[in-house]
A protein has these predicted regions:
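Structural transition elements
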Residues: 387-422, 438-447
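N-terminal lobe/hinge region of extracytoplasmic solute-binding protein
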Residues: 76-83, 96-147, 178, 261-262
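A structural "hinge/loop" feature
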Residues: 80-86, 99-117, 139, 166, ...
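Ligand-site clamp/hinge motif
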Residues: 251-254, 282-327
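A bilobed periplasmic-binding-protein/Venus flytrap-type ligand-binding module shared by bacterial periplasmic
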Residues: 130, 280-283, 341-366, 370, ...
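Detector for C-terminal structural segments
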Residues: 24, 38, 78, 272, ...
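Gly/Pro-rich hinge or "lid" segments in bacterial periplasmic/extracellular proteins
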Residues: 130, 208-215, 219-220, 225-290, ...
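Surface-exposed, Gly/Pro/Thr- and Asp/Glu-enriched linker/hinge segments
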Residues: 22-93, 136, 162-174, 178-226, ...
Length: 591
């Protein structure tokens, strides 16, 4: 959800992603709206679109750009790249790019990638992810873990402060965890990301007034105790649910989010809904002040390519309509193309297994076998996406290339329908409505139209489609109001628990399909506490296969392996990663 529900889309191919218990910008583990169009892109920080075509014409340029930008087909360590380039960095200037209005700027309730992109720049937590996706110190300068693996003792950096200069203390850490766990905060992701901490679930349930697992030792020391040792716990603390807020700022004003007092590399300087969101650099940032004076996000809309070519914005993703031109070595813009890594995300159609006809696994399986993912990806999506074979995306920890998954098999699909409780009498099937993100009267995405048509032709099953605005869709999704829905999930942190446990454990708030398998639950719980990584990943491979066999999802697409963005030649230090993390402090303008 960054929804981790993570929205991958800000400028080009729109796939709405939910990450981290929510949604995020893709490419977050976050959930994303899943749409594919010529004008929208879904990918990493910039949302470039990918295309699996012969790109030999652009490869020499891409290779050169990789040295400059750290875009990761052969990037090595981006951290080393940042250090090597620091001596050339120039202070000052503004970066201008397209953006979208955030559903919220409260870190403790955010579940979408658009919100999280801004929140990541304004706030911070005890730890963060670096450009190589390692967990590294943020507000904490160091920590120790007890011998039993359950207690983490964090030592805060000296002289860290909020944007207004107020010192950050261990009491602020304690208060922030208390706030996110307060039922009145109504965080949809607190239990998902913080439920391992002793006392969080009790406070969420209203049976305790405090989170006993978070203890202030002194002004610069705080301990966090979890219920069982878990290899991924530190990674969870990089999600905005764990970000540290200023109690005075939050409690003194109902509109505190419009004047947030964070600890991040940027301050929120201006926000006009539907017009502009402007971030200004925090010169006192404890990890190093940003080079930029400000980052301006244009929220009024516009076509990215046209705005880029007229020098209204400094970077944009490349969509279907423009990709061939950009790949042409005779095109002037070819020299400004940058290759980006594939996002750690998956677009899918979810089915509520408690709602007929999806309470019958034969129907769920039949729909998975009744359309040709490869043809739709190659022809309809023009190679901009690759067919998803399962839940965990390629390149992600515990990805299983040998997963026994779905193929296009019409006869098998028809037999599965006959084997269902509905038999051959399709008139007995309940009406099926697929909910997708979109505006009233807007055209349905080409991939969904193709899939719907395939189901009608191959099986005689007719699907109605209902479009809903993203904010409403997200709330209804969390409330499990949908029989069938198309969305996406982007990684919040690099651990398979972020996909399999958060999305499929029967107790998870993000289990929008209401999937419930006691054997899967037991294996997920076993994987949580397994300390041997190889054994953990073997468990997750087994779990993923069990879920695929029962088909609560229809996996659709992963991000392509060749994604492109356009970046002005004087914009330096723009590093793209497979996940949504803070990146703007590394950027500088050199002209």
């Amino acid at each position: 959800m960054r929804f981790s529900w993570y929205i991958l889309a800000i400028t080009l191919l729109t796939v709405f992603v939910v990450a981290c218990g929510g949604t995020k910008e893709l490419p977050t583990a976050q959930e994303l709206p899943s749409a594919v169009s010529d004008d929208k892109s879904v990918a990493t920080q910039l949302d470039p679109i990918s295309k699996n075509t012969d790109s030999s014409a652009i490869q020499p340029i891409v290779a050169a750009k990789e040295k400059e930008f750290g875009s990761s087909t052969q990037q090595g360590s981006l951290n080393e790249k940042v250090l090597a380039d620091a001596s050339d960095a120039v202070n000052g200037g503004s970066l201008i790019r397209l953006g979208s209005d955030p559903p919220t700027l409260d870190p403790h309730v955010a579940t979408d990638s658009v919100s999280i992109m801004y929140i990541n720049e304004i706030y911070g937590g005890l730890v963060t992810l670096d450009l190589d996706l390692n967990v590294v110190p943020d507000l904490a300068e160091s920590w120790e873990v007890s011998d039993n693996g359950r207690t983490y003792t964090f030592h805060l950096r000296p002289n860290i402060s909020f944007h207004n200069g107020k010192p950050v203390t261990a009491s602020d850490v304690k208060w922030s965890f208390e706030r996110v766990s307060d039922p009145n905060t109504q965080s949809p992701v607190a239990e998902t990301y913080l439920g391992d901490i002793l006392g969080v679930q009790d406070k969420l349930a209203g049976s305790s007034s405090s989170v006993v697992g978070v203890e202030v030792i002194d002004d610069r020391t705080v301990s966090i105790t979890i219920n069982e040792p878990k290899a991924y716990f530190l990674s969870k603390l990089t999600y905005p649910t764990s970000f540290i807020l200023d109690e005075n700022s939050v409690t003194e004003s109902d509109d505190w989010m419009l004047r947030p007092n964070g600890t991040g590399p940027f301050r929120l300087w201006e926000y006009e809904t539907g017009e502009v969101l402007r971030l200004s650099g925090n010169e006192g940032y404890h990890l190093g002040a940003p080079y930029l004076d400000e980052v301006e996000f244009i929220l009024a809309g516009g076509q990215g390519m046209l705005m880029y070519e007229s020098d209204e914005i400094h970077l944009t993703g490349v969509g279907r309509a423009d990709l061939s031109r950009i790949l042409d070595p005779n095109e002037p813009l070819n020299s400004e193309a940058v290759q980006a890594p594939a996002a750690f995300s998956v677009a899918y159609i979810g089915m509520n297994v408690n709602e007929p006809p999806f309470d019958d696994p034969n129907i769920r399986l039949a729909l998975n076998y009744a359309f040709d993912r490869h043809t739709i990806a190659d022809v309809v999506l023009e190679g901009l996406r690759i067919p998803a074979q399962g839940i965990i995306p390629p390149g992600f920890p515990a990805f299983n290339p040998d997963l026994d998954t779905y193929t296009f098999d019409t006869e098998k699909a028809k037999q599965l329908v006959r084997d269902s409780k509905y038999g051959s009498d399709l008139s007995a099937l309940p009406r099926i409505t697929l909910n997708v993100v979109g505006g009233f009267g807007a055209p349905v995405d080409d991939d969904i139209e193709a899939i719907r048509r395939a189901w009608e032709v191959e099986l005689g099953i007719i699907i109605d489609i209902q479009q809903t605005a993203w904010a409403t869709f997200l709330q209804d999704l969390h409330d499990r109001r949908y029989q069938m829905f198309k969305v996406g999930w982007g990684a919040d942190y690099p651990d398979p628990e972020n996909f399999l446990d958060i999305l499929f454990h029967s107790s998870s708030d993000n289990n929008h399909s209401s999937y419930n398998n006691p054997q899967v639950d037991a294996l997920l719980e076993q994987a949580r506490v397994e300390r041997n990584q190889d054994t953990r990943f073997e468990l997750y491979n087994r779990i993923e296969q069990m879920i695929i066999d029962e088909a609560p999802w229809i996996p659709l697409w992963n991000s392509g392996t060749e994604s492109y963005a356009l970046v002005k030649p004087y914009v330096k230090g723009f590093y793209m990663t497979p996940m949504s993390i803070p990146i703007h402090r590394y950027i500088y303008i050199d002209k």
